[in-house]
A protein has these predicted regions:
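C-terminal beta-strand-loop-alpha-helix "lid" module of Rossmann-like NAD(P)-dependent dehydrogenases
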Residues: 1-207
Length: 207
């Protein structure tokens, strides 16, 4: 599951996800029957060039809510249960602060510590039963995990775009100052040349 943005002008926000997605597909999975679920237009456009895109969810950011994310999570869980996928990872930009985003790869399914918990022989009494609790809580937990990843990515996108635009503004201001200085120097040189020509002409007339 590759989470990117629908728009550009956000620095390396999307390209970092492209790089991580390609790296996982080629080095970790050795290009062995890898499929992507693309969340975001930029990721969908990039991944379609080289990989199989199982589905894309471009419009989710138009009205991001738990209900729409739950539908995606349910689809992923269903494909995992039906053994269409044997492992599902989520690749996204984790929000650290407005200026810093960290690309992370989280395992979505299978749940890594489920087997370890199952072998825990602690003497607990569950009401309702352990299986009923797991069947109820695990889907909710996975939906929340995906929702958090998308929200993190969304916040990171805005932070990355704000930082990129701030840098662009600073660069434009610096370029403007350089051009202004060059213009003033050229103007001063032109005025000096004109004065020299006038003085030279006056001296020639006097002679």
């Amino acid at each position: 599951v590759s989470i990117t943005s629908n728009r550009g002008l956000c620095g390396g926000f999307n390209s970092n996800i492209f790089k991580k997605s390609t790296e996982l597909a080629s080095s970790v999975y050795n290009d062995s029957d890898v499929s992507f679920v693309a969340i975001g237009k930029k990721g969908n456009d990039f991944l379609q060039k080289s990989f199989n895109v199982e589905s894309n969810h471009i419009d989710i950011f138009d009205n991001l809510n738990m209900e729409s994310v739950s539908l995606i999570a349910e689809s992923l869980m269903e494909k995992f249960v039906n053994e269409d996928f044997d492992k599902i990872d989520i690749i996204y930009n984790k929000f650290k602060n407005a200026a810093t985003q960290v690309v992370v790869n989280e395992q979505f399914l299978p749940i890594s510590d489920l087997e370890e918990d199952a072998n825990n022989n602690s003497d607990y009494i569950f009401e309702p039963s352990k299986s009923e609790i797991i069947e109820e809580l695990i889907p909710k937990s996975l939906k929340n995990q995906l929702f958090k990843a998308i929200r993190d990515s969304w916040a990171s996108e805005h932070g990355a775009r704000m930082t990129a635009m701030h840098k662009a503004t600073d660069n434009a201001t610096e370029l403007r100052d350089q051009l202004k200085l060059a213009y003033n120097q050229a103007r001063q040189a032109a005025i000096t040349n004109e004065i020299l020509e006038i003085v030279g002409g006056a001296e020639a007339l006097n002679n």
